[in-house]
């Protein structure tokens, strides 16, 4: 009898541990879902940035067709692009790679690309180079530096979403426990009729009702 009760308790403990493991896995899955959503935004931002770069090259191309490009008008376009945006700096180069003009943060390209080993801040920068097409080939190149760093407000929103999902899982668990105790309160289930338990000799209420009807 004691062995049977111990076996039953072990089975129940295994079931409880299994359910808790599933709950932890679901909560971690909620965190993974939020992080994966954030990662999926990066390719979309890059695609939008390349679309913007192509549009900028179309505006700059007429200013590059002469022997001496109009630096003032090109610089005005670049200032408009880099003003209060996630584009840190922008530069236009001729077909030989010589800088014509640039706008935005005054950071050296070597430092921006961390070519000298100084990687502070370069982890969150991404370079986009788009050719400025002409009739007979590229007239030059446009270089943009994107800020891919996640802002504190965006990170906080992701954390809030994760916490809400976890709270919903815990509430679902609590509701399930309350419903189970409410619906099964005072009722013994079929597993309690096992011959190895002390309650085996006591019939369940359903059987008592059937006997009274007969």
Curated annotation (Swiss-Prot):
It is a single-pass membrane protein. The chain crosses the membrane at residues 164-184. The gene is smp. Keywords: Cell membrane, Membrane, Signal, Transmembrane, Transmembrane helix. This is Protein Smp. InterPro entries: Uncharacterised_Smp (IPR019305). Belongs to the Smp family. GO terms for cellular component: plasma membrane. It comes from the Bacteria. It comes from Salmonella typhimurium (strain LT2 / SGSC1412 / ATCC 700720). Its main location: membrane. It is found in: Cell membrane. Residues 1-30 form the signal peptide.
